[in-house]
C-alpha cells in the first residue's frame, strides 16, 4: 500500500509543470530503491529525528538550493489532486505565507513555505489532534500568514485505511482517488 501511495504522490507532483520534485526518503539504505521508483526526482535524505527535525532538514535543503518556495507533502493523502498543489503554488506567491492542508485527525497532509522556518517545526506535538492548531499558533507567532486548503482525510491508522476502502466510491466527484491505488482496490 505504501508503494501505491508513493507512486501516486510522485505522479501527482509531476503533473504540476512548474515544480521540481525532491523526494525525502528514509532510511539511508533505501536510496537506490527510491531512485529507481522515483526516476526523475531528486533525492534528499530525511535523516534522523522526529517529524519536525526531518521537515526542517528537507525544507532547509530545498531553500539552500535557491528555491523561493517549497511544498512538503506526505504520501498518505490519496485524495489529493493537482488542483490543490496549484492552489498552494498560487498562495505561495504572497511573501511570508505558510500553506497548510488540514487533515481530519488534527494534523496536516501538506505544508507550503516561502522561506526556511526551522522554528515552525520545533517542539510541535506530532501525530496528535493538536498538530495543526499548534502549527497555526507558531505561524502567527513568526509573523506569517496562514493559507488553509480544503480539509482532507489522510491514512495514518488501520481505521483510516478501512474508511478509505469502504468509502472511496462515494467521494465528491471533484476529488479523485489516486490512479495506482484505485486500480489496486478495483482488483
Feature-to-residue mapping (PLM):
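Active-site rim beta-loop-alpha module in soluble metabolic enzymes
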Residues: 103, 113-114, 122
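Conserved alpha/beta core of the MobA/IspD/sugar-nucleotide pyrophosphorylase nucleotidyltransferase superfamily
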Residues: 133, 137-187
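Short aromatic-hydrophobic micro-motifs that form the base-stacking/packing surface
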Residues: 71-73
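Short, glycine-/small-residue-rich phosphate/pyrophosphate-handling segment
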Residues: 117-138
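A short, N-terminal amphipathic alpha-helix
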Residues: 2-18
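Short beta-strand/loop segment that forms part of the nucleotide-sugar
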Residues: 18-27
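Conserved donor-nucleotide/metal-binding helix-loop-beta segment in metal-dependent transferases, i.e.
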Residues: 80-105
Amino acid at each position: 500500500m505504501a508503494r501505491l501511495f508513493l507512486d501516486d504522490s510522485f505522479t501527482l507532483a509531476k503533473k504540476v509543470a512548474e515544480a521540481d520534485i525532491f523526494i525525502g526518503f528514509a532510511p539511508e539504505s533505501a536510496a537506490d530503491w527510491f531512485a529507481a521508483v522515483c526516476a526523475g526526482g531528486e533525492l534528499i535524505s530525511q535523516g534522523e529525528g522526529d517529524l519536525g527535525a526531518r521537515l526542517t532538514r528537507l525544507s532547509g535543503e530545498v531553500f539552500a538550493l535557491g528555491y523561493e518556495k517549497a511544498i512538503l507533502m506526505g504520501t498518505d493523502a490519496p485524495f489529493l489532486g493537482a488542483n490543490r498543489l496549484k492552489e498552494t503554488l498560487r498562495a505561495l506567491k504572497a511573501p511570508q505565507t505558510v500553506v497548510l492542508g488540514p487533515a481530519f485527525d488534527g494534523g496536516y497532509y501538506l505544508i507550503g513555505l516561502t522561506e526556511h522556518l526551522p522554528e515552525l517545526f520545533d517542539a510541535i506535538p506530532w501525530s496528535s489532534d493538536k498538530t495543526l492548531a499548534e502549527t497555526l499558533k507558531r505561524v502567527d507567532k513568526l509573523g506569517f500568514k496562514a493559507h488553509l486548503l480544503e480539509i482532507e482525510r489522510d491514512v495514518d491508522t488501520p481505521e483510516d485505511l478501512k474508511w478509505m476502502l469502504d468509502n472511496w466510491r462515494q467521494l465528491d466527484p471533484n476529488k479523485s482517488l489516486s490512479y495506482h491505488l484505485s486500480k489496486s482496490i478495483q482488483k
